[in-house]
Amino acid sequence: MKNLTLAVCVYNAEKYIKETLQSIMAQTMQDFYLLIVNDCSTDGSIAIIEEFFAENPRQYELVSFEENKGIGYARHFAERYAQTEYMMFLDADDILYRHAIETMYKRITSDNELMAVGCYLEYIDKKGEKIGGGIFLGEKTKESFRKKAVAKKLFFMQPTAIYNRELALSVGGYVIEGYPKGKPRYQDFCEDLDLWTRMSDLYKYGKAIIVVPEVLCKYRKGSGLSSNSFNMIIKMRYTKTNLLRRRNGKKELTFIEFYDSLSPAQLKEMHKDANAADALRNGAYYLKKGNLLNGVWEIIRCIYYRPLYIWDKIKHNSGIKK
């Protein structure tokens, strides 16, 4: 009996979904359920998926929403719809290396103390070409994970990971309740950070989350101007606040309660952090486009808002923190 569900949440991914499916079909391990969640795509994504599997038969299940719900809701649904012990998500525009699933699955099933196993990602552009950098986050050993968990740290790890679905659900899984209606959908930002941090509470039962320190997936990185950093930063602060509340035996806040509790001064500081993040990304965008003047100006703006932000990004995205 298959013990792993691979879920791909799709929304208007017609340019990339075929390449993603090809990487799934090329996996050295195929003993998993494939669940595709269509988040009310309005392009040709679903036709491409159906045509692909007509030509390349394998088990898959397609579930379609009647309205667009967002990635947070789609993962929340898939996590509860699946019946297997283990779960994995893959973005509809990312590409797995052939041994990715087998490598992570063997690792997590070899040690009952492991509740999630991730990997490193490398960045590619819209054409699938490597652009340098990647995501090299996560602890490589159970000991380093537990040290971090005891210290009440947020747990950053990329989303392409295999995790114990039942343990995740025991701490709430992907949470969508308690958020304001409409956009921005704060539940769609840093949803993986929230999940891993919730699961890190289980360190007290001897459980751990680690990464295989190997690049196993290609992550398609957008190259446009950035403007969403504030939403991510406030979600990170919310996740940290609830981490501390849980560890201190207090009831968690809903996102609405957390936002309403923030003072004008706190919001101002978060906007500074967001401005630094957006400026750095936009500076890199302009420099890549050959627009030296705007690129340098954005870098200066980043340094003005947060002088150490650039160095922190270099450490995380270059792999220095491996």
Labelled PLM ranges:
Residues 38-47, 67, 91:
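A conserved acidic beta->alpha catalytic loop
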Residues 201-203, 209, 213-322:
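C-terminal subregions of glycosyltransferases and related glycan-biosynthesis enzymes
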Residues 144-232, 237:
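Conserved nucleotide-sugar donor-binding catalytic segment
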Residues 87:
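Short aromatic/hydrophobic "clamp" motif used to bind/position activated sugar donors
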Residues 2-5, 25-36, 44, 57-61:
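Short loop->beta transition adjacent to catalytic acidic/histidine clusters or analogous donor-positioning motifs
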Residues 13-26:
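Short, well-formed alpha-helical segments that are part of the catalytic scaffolds
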Residues 57-58, 73, 101-177:
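Flexible acidic/His/Gly-enriched loops in nucleotide-sugar-dependent glycosyltransferase catalytic domains
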Residues 65-82:
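Glycine-rich, basic loop-to-helix element that forms the pyrophosphate-binding segment
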